[in-house]
Structure formats: C-alpha cells, structure tokens
UniProtKB/Swiss-Prot annotation:
InterPro entries per UniProt: Hist_DNA-bd (IPR000119), Histone-like_DNA-bd_CS (IPR020816), IHF-like_DNA-bd_dom_sf (IPR010992), IHF_alpha (IPR005684)
Organism: Acinetobacter baylyi (strain ATCC 33305 / BD413 / ADP1)
SMART domains: BHL (SM00411)
One record GO biological process: DNA recombination
A GO CC term assigned to this protein in UniProt: cytosol
Cysteine pairs bridged by disulfides in the record: none
UniProt name for this protein: Integration host factor subunit alpha
Amino acid sequence: MTALTKADMADHLSELTSLNRREAKQMVELFFDEISQALIAGEHVKLSGFGNFELRDKRERPGRNPKTGEEIPISARRVVTFRAGQKFRQRVGTEQE
C-alpha cells in the first residue's frame, strides 16, 4: 500500500493547473497551514463534501504500562479529530482500487 504525500498532491495540482511545481507546493503548504491556524485559534474546520476537523481536550485518565502492569496517569492533552462527511464516506465506500 502506498501513501499520498504532500509532494504527490503538489505534483497533481501542477499537472491539472497552470501552476509550476514550486507554486503548487506552496499552495498545498498554505492549505494545510490555514487548517492548522484555524484549529489553533479554536475554530472548527468544515470542508464541504469532505469532512470536519476539530480540536478536542482530553482529560487526564489512568493508564497501565503494558510491560509491568504498573498504573500510570495519562496526562491531559489536546487532540485533532476528523469526521468524514457523508459524501466522502459514500465515495470512498463505493470506489474500487
């Protein structure tokens, strides 16, 4: 299984538009920077037809070291969650490789 990288995205964007590779790479970087900055600012990111990104706070909770069985606390932290939109789920669920 292969992975789609930012470089791959920039190459595809360059092929489909009049942007050169450098400009396409910059566009991809700006897109992800915009999402990151919105999340840092506490905003929800809603991409129609794709899905929603959200920043959530997780509370501290008890955990366990799997090797020793010792109980250890898992500290509170912020996590990014993604919920795929209905159109995206339908598209991914019906397309063949």
